[in-house]
Amino acid sequence: IIGETVVGMILAMTRGILPAATTFADLAWPRQELNGILRPLRGSHVVILGLGNIGDWIGKLLKPFGVRISGMRRSLSKPAPDWFDEHDCIFTECDLDKVLPTADHLVLALPGTPDTTNIMDARRISLLQKHSTICNVGRGNSIEEKPLYAALEARRIAGACLDVFQTEPLPANSILKRCTNLWRLPHASAIAATYLDLYVEDFARQWHDWASFEQEL
């Protein structure tokens, strides 16, 4: 479910759905304003911080769009996902600064731990390209919000979709509410009427995979 939300976030920013909804409030026909914003998802580089279960699903759902995936893990000991091709790669945090300048879309699916706090700080946000987008569906501690706001306001990055924040609910006076190129969800990326059914189905699948592996041993 979270993976579907991320796909929707990226498409909505890249294909102008969210920017159009914002600019239509001020302009009668903002076609010209969107001319320099719209980009294809196909052929882009998506960097996923946190290639665990959620990050794996995000990449799997994005791959059919013809993107290249780079996923960050704590170590390189585990095998790559079965949907990886020769253009995809796994890296660790020590290479993050090298990867960020190549990212068209940055997705954060990290747990909330001391190690992930402000992993995207002012310096790392500054490494992103002007057309880059950010999606955060992990935990709000992973992005330093003031430099994110500054980068969005100055249009040093194209836009961001955030489902999580450092303080939740988001305070009424939050500076993030001023950004016209930032779109927010109230920690709702996993909400669905069929969530419990899908959770049980996924658990059963993982249990079956584990049992099959044990039997092979």
Give the ranges of each region predicted by the language model.
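Adenosine-phosphate binding glycine-rich loop
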Residues: 170-172, 178-201, 206-207, 211
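Conserved acidic E/D residue at the C-terminus of a beta-strand in Rossmann-like folds
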Residues: 73
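Residues at the starts of beta-strands that form the adenosine-phosphate
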Residues: 45, 64-68, 181
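Hydrophobic "lid"/C-terminal helical patch
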Residues: 6, 10, 103, 152, ...
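Rossmann-like adenosine-cofactor binding region
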Residues: 76-175
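Glycine-rich adenosine-cofactor-binding loop
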Residues: 39-63
